[in-house]
Curated annotation (Swiss-Prot):
GO cellular component, one term: DNA-directed RNA polymerase complex
Any GO MF annotation of the entry: DNA-directed RNA polymerase activity
EC class: transferase
Assigned EC number: 2.7.7.6
Function according to Swiss-Prot or TrEMBL: DNA-dependent RNA polymerase catalyzes the transcription of DNA into RNA using the four ribonucleoside triphosphates as substrates.
Keyword entries, A-Z: DNA-directed RNA polymerase, Nucleotidyltransferase, Transcription, Transferase
InterPro entries reported in the protein's UniProt record: DNA-dir_RNA_pol_bsu_ext_1_sf, DNA-dir_RNA_pol_bsu_external_1, DNA-dir_RNA_pol_su2, DNA-dir_RNAP_su2_dom, DNA-dir_RNAP_su2_hyb_sf, RNA_pol_bsu_bac, RNA_pol_bsu_CS, RNA_pol_bsu_protrusion
Name used for this protein in its record: DNA-directed RNA polymerase subunit beta
UniProt-listed GO biological process terms: DNA-templated transcription
Subunit note: The RNAP catalytic core consists of 2 alpha, 1 beta, 1 beta' and 1 omega subunit. When a sigma factor is associated with the core the holoenzyme is formed, which can initiate transcription.
Amino acid sequence: MLNGHVVNYGQHRTRRSFSRIKEILPLPNLTDVQTESYKWFLDEGVKEVFDDILPISDTSGRLTLEYVDYKLQEPKYTVDESRKHDATYSAPMHVTLKLTNHETGEIKTQDVFFGDLPLMTKSGSFIVNGAERVIVSQLVRSPGVYYSGEFDKNGRQIFGTTVIPNRGAWLEFETDAKNISYVRVDRTRKLPLSVLVRALGFGSDSEIKEIFGDSDTLDLTLDKDVHKNPADSRVAEALKDIYDRLRPGEPKTTDSSRSLLVSRFFDPRRYDLAAVGRYKVNKKLSLKNRLLGYTLAETLADPDTGEVLAAKGTVVNNEVMDVLKDYLDRDDFKTVTYTPSDEGVIPEPVTVQEIKVFSREIPDREIKLISNGHIAEDVKCITPADIIASVNYFLELQEGVGNIDDIDHLGNRRIRRVGELLQNQMRIGLARMERVVRERMSIQDAATVTPQQLINIRPIVGSIKEFFGSSQLSQFMDQNNPLGELTHKRRMSALGPGGLSRDRAGYEVRDVHYTHYGRLCPIETPEGPNIGLINSMATYAIINKYGFLETPYRRVSWATHKVTDKIDYLTADEEDNYIIAGANTPLNEDGSFVDDVILCRHREDNVEVSPDRIDYIDVIPKQVVSVTSACIPFLENDDSNRALMGANHQRQAVPLINPHGPLVATGMEYRAGHDSGDALLAEADGEVEYVDANEIRVRREDQTLDTYTLEKYRRSNATKNYNQTPNVKRGDKVVDGQVIANGPSMADGELALGQNPVIAFTTWNMYNFEDAIMLSERLVKEDVYTSIHIEDYDSEARDTKLGPEEITREIPNVGEDALKDLDENGIIRIGAEVHDGDILVGKVTPKGITELSAEERLLHAIFGEKAREVRDTSLRVPHGGGGVVQDVQVFTREAGDELAPGVNTLVRVYIVQKRKIQVGDKMSGRHGNKGTVALIAPVEDMPYLPDGTPVDICLNPMGVPSRMNIGQLLEIHLGRAARALGIHVATPVFDGASEDDVWDFVREAGVDSDGKTVLYDGRTGEPFHNRVSVGVMYYLKLTHMVDDKIHARSIGPYSLVTQQPLGGKAQFGGQRFGEMEVWALEAYGAAYTLQEILTYKSDDVVGRVKAYEAIVKGERITKPGVPESFRVLVKELQSLGLDLRVLDSDENEVELRDMDEDSNEHVNIDALSRLAEAQEKKKLAEEEAEIAAEAEAEGSAEEDAAEADADANEAETADDDKASK
């Protein structure tokens, strides 16, 4: 009997799973994080924004513009058409507005076009200008009130408070070394804290003391805050002090000061806590959290019956709080109303809730705890009650009452998803539009004006376009494979507008926090400067209405202490109140705990507790990690650094032409493929009637016919092949949501990123030194690791000042053989095989020539002769871009295509490359065990097993111990056993096969029980000295392929200032020979080599031209001249006012070349090319005389080709020369 149990993943794959924990909660849809948020935006978000900004009234109150409703019309293009036409997939938005004229009572209602709103595709992406993009969710600090504490150099704890709104002015409180409290309003200079309280209308010291009670800090602060101007009351003076900080130097009155403070904090248009901010403020200042653990200094009674709830001296524990909880929510329980003076900011009574407790430090000292009362959730502004309660919390922190906040805690960080980001952007646009509307209301005639005339939609359209086009959070979708796509949609970034910047982010914010458990993956994050700032959402995490991450837990019954199937989703700050056991905790059949003492989590500690103290238990072990990390088998046996690499490598796997699912999987592959959006899913139950490569037809049970069209060989964002293949056959029964066609990198409905080669951990003639990989030629011959790459090239025919460019077959100075694959219009035919430099689209551009005379113009009009000079600007295949032409698309204005201004015709050519695995390509397993291919050996030379099976890949065993990714060893043993048994297995993360399970499985499969085998050398037939670990590991080919990186340069472009070659493949640049490389040549005394590298091959402008000339003529190369960089240095010093001259050995001044005067030294390589051409022709003529007539024909063809090359070179160098001048 084999270990494990059989699990079906979809309709087409069965695996033997080693999991022990039953999955009681299905995985949520993995792209909901995007789609649900956008749905909320359309259903509620848009209305919210309009309700925030509208109604708009003019200053005199004659006209009011109100929002009624909005609707989206049908999109102009479908998703596929948007891709093809480089358009945005969007729908026109029409808003119904109502304009009321209060003088006449007339109401005008009108539908106004508000621009196009980009729509989300079914899979959660957007198509903007033909490219698929994803809006990444942002992890930001939540609005709310935060308390901090740090120790000064004397060891005293200094506290601070920040009230952060969603938008608007910040309010900060702080203490100094003398224990005086200060306030900063909107990050200005500080004022004594009492000034803010006085500005609320509580002017006298006695009023302030009555509200806050006695405290040393408060007394010192009041002493500091002296009455400077007896002419003003204390309230008026306080208002003016704040005005002075916000607008220094401006004349101030009590009224202007009051209205400024009102507009900063109490005007909903300028200050917004948002629903989440109000929730956080209410929660932080509520007495429920603050009373726990303190002794009451007064008796609490029921306001209706007078029954004592808790007597004075009672310690408030959880049981007492259960009694008080409902009373604390009542408006008539322990509430106190304070009446401010009429001069205050808001002269209305302030109601707060107060309860007295005893201090812990001085037991007989009474402390007053003040909460902000019961402020409704829809109050988005801060209120005087909030300010009083937050000041009280701040003052009581000095007495040791209350907690300071951890800003990296996920209870204090929230997620802004697509819907909210888009809503904020729309709000910015509408706020800009509001100003325009107000202006137009005052200018235009009230009797005749319509809503349409008041509205200017440019700011709204502009802000939405700007967001999708250039925001840091709007990213080009990673479309390497379905896993990369899915991960991109679930990514959480702390960067972006309103977030952190990577330069200022410290270690704390990047580090894994205990609240990440089940919410953010502790493993998957990029290596490099963004580490820890970009995270991935955990598999089971969801986002609540406030934007906080929640993770599910199974409830443990308080009565029976047994685990129930009741699921609760908890936010990070709710979880802090509970003790939680791990999912692997042993349970009895009835749900009770096996052990008497259980290791659990409480906040950041691991605690050992008895079962009666446990509140919750994890749902499943994989809830801790992200989708990508959950695809790594034996993750628990890998070091975290390598696990991080393994997760990142899977996203870089290239889709292969014949992928296979992993023999050793985790069970996550099916859901990853299903939810990625790349698989084709059945929309209803039914039976398959027809299948071919392009479409599948399914007859539903109600007899309607669904036709599904498959994507064939489309270029993905990452220039990979996006192709769907059927996963069903005729007569199959399908169910709703079933995978009926695999996407790229999928097989049998599962994610299939690589292949299952036979791998041996052995060295082989030093070829796999330092992470190099040795492959068998079988992998090349049988196309095991072959992938298809599709690149597109565009050629635009524009209007120029000298006339329109023309797409034509008649290209000057190009031989007939270069045009053999072009059609009559000069466009390459589909199916043609093209190589570097071949013409794809023939195009000519008018050259700048003198104006034609009247006679020439007449001749031209009559005979239509080509009197005009044109130059060849054809689209050619770039270096390394050769392949087969897959498709050609032509867009013209005549056909009604939308083209960019000035473009008459656009031709797009798609070229396909079939890339086999080759030396230099990067490969990796799922455990961060990456390497590059160093040798592809013939199959007969590869080491082979006793049964004659040759090994496919040899990896260096030295790559394992120091890296500590032992998961790969367990994987090869399990893989070998699975291959021997002909089955697929699943070993879920943290709940998979143990080491004992692996060895049992290996023994049952009948292979060597130590996982090793005798290996024979393929060249000699001799066995290797030691037994070798051999098995099957899932191995991937990554996107870093040598074909994209290999590059060589002979003649190319130069930098204008330094005259040195440019760098990089894209610029056709040279190789940098840096300071350390110069030292190396100096060390070897290689003077001549060094000299030519620093002169001819770099920036000796005259010398390099003369060297080229000498090579062409076959002469000796002259001595090098002065490098251009020396001249630049001299000019730099001269520009600083230093009179610097260069002298030769005889102390005569050397004149340095001046670019503008000495244009001859900028020798044109054209002349040299022509010289080379002439010599070539002469040579050919001599050969022609000697050889026979058949060879003559051949010779002329060569000459044509040489001529075409020389002309191309001439055009190129002429352009370069012009640029450098």
